[in-house]
Amino acid sequence: MNMKKMFLLNLPYLLFVYPFDKLAQAFRLAPGADLSGKLLSIGDGFTAALSSPWLSFQPTDLLIGIAGAVVLRMAVYLKGKNAKKYRHGIEYGSARWGTAADIAPYMDKDFFQNIPMTQTERITMASRPKQPKYARNKNILVIGGSGSGKTRFFCKPSLLQAHSSYVCTDPKGTLLPEIGTFLERKKYRIKCLNLINFRKSMKYNPLAYIRSEKDILKLVNALIMNTKGEGEKSSEDSWVKAERLYYSALIGYIWYEATEEEKNFITLLDLINASEAREDDETYQSPVDLLFSQLEEREPDHFAVKQYRKFKMAAGKTLKSILISCGARLAPFDIKELRDLMEYDELELDTLGDQKTALFVILSDTDSTFNFVAALMYSQLFNLLCDKADDFYGGRLPVHVRLILDEFANIGQIENFDKLIATIRSREISASIILQSQSQLKTIYKDAADTIVGNCDSTLFLGGKEKSTLKEISELLGKETIDLYNQSENRGSQVSHGLSYQKLGKELMTQDELAVMDGGKCIFMLRGVRPFLSDKYDLTRHPNYRYTADADPKNVFDMERYMKKQRAVVKPTDTFDVYEIDATT
């Protein structure tokens, strides 16, 4: 306790020096030779003492005054220290629903600089408010069963704010047509990775974002992590480790040695198809072996050579099995449309934080065959944006990037996501994780699921009936103290009645109450604030609703038309062949 606080705490007791001082003065001035005489004439003593309003500075009087004040202070201290601690009205819990006053410090006065959570609650986009105690990260956990309105009540209102760049998972492929026209009106660059209909997708080339050898290893890790077969062990065996070496060697070779046009997954697949190992002839060299032999002669310390040399330590039979595993893992790339999709890059992932951009990732919600491509993209996106913020913008992107990850469980596993979500806040990046139940997160991220949830300052529950989710939400809401009134009646030879009152603790909402919650209601929880039971956001009341296809079918966005228009625009970085025409002939 600092000196200033201690002084202020004891200051009131200095006032008691005066009455004790006057009491001592009255006793001293009272006529009488002994104690009984002075007590009998104490009235005369008070008359004499109070004739002057000033404190008596006679040493005995002053000492008694100070001693009296000290004794009184000690008595109050001891009484408070030994007093029983009562929490009247909150004996079993103090949980309650939040009010408008509770959320007010966390909302921006400008409606469009907020994230709409419910009809009455919003959270500001400002990462550094005037009062630091009101700072919250913008990571949001949204939980809602099928049909609870995750897209309508959360995704669409978020996009209509148009205050950030957005990367939005679109499981049904309906969000882009319904919101795209509005975003184009707001001068957004619109990107689309369509893994349902490849012909309606922009090109995505993972190799276009490799800047160093560590990026090669990150890409290989993400590729292997998201192309595991059903029931495959989470721990790697020696074959998977050998595959890792092989992919690293091939991608390293492509990145260092191939032309710009060849730096893509098609070249990687061609190299794998040209690879061969023979059980009966370990001296046999495939075309790929010859490529690496030539590279080793020229640069023996080359990154790709080192990786390939380790891979070739295996025997011929083992190498053949590894190559078969590589072919099986990359089997989806045998589809020509997917190969064409990854021929070159149009997504420009590293520029999302430079200017307002909306990237829609369209995934199938019934078939996860190509979802690994989205997981690759997200893994690269996080690393690219963090590096861009650190290397070019002093740690903070000029445009906030919001990732609205609808059906997050279908995306696949994003490498080190539990670590990324804890660090992206300072770079002006945030993630909204949208799930049908909290158990989905634990299925994919295992023990790291709790870390991910813990780094989301906001939780929005739209309804559901999955048991573990209901239990978690009920516990987070806490308990309130209620009054219990019991009435009893005993019948015998005489009838007697009894009344009793007691207090009990009750969950703010029990699991069964959560399960039958009104479909128009939702629960919003913000770290450090009481939870809110509110109406879901009414999309039709958003100021920009009239620009959506929901309001007017004429606003449907045509991505194919948009892509044709964008590809027709000449960019400063485009290259062309120049031919001279002889006009004299």
Give the residues covered by each predicted segment.
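Conserved ATP-driven motor cores of ASCE-family P-loop NTPases powering translocation/secretion/packaging/pilus
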Residues: I421-I523
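P-loop NTPase motor domains
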Residues: P19-D21, Q25, R136-I429, I444, ...
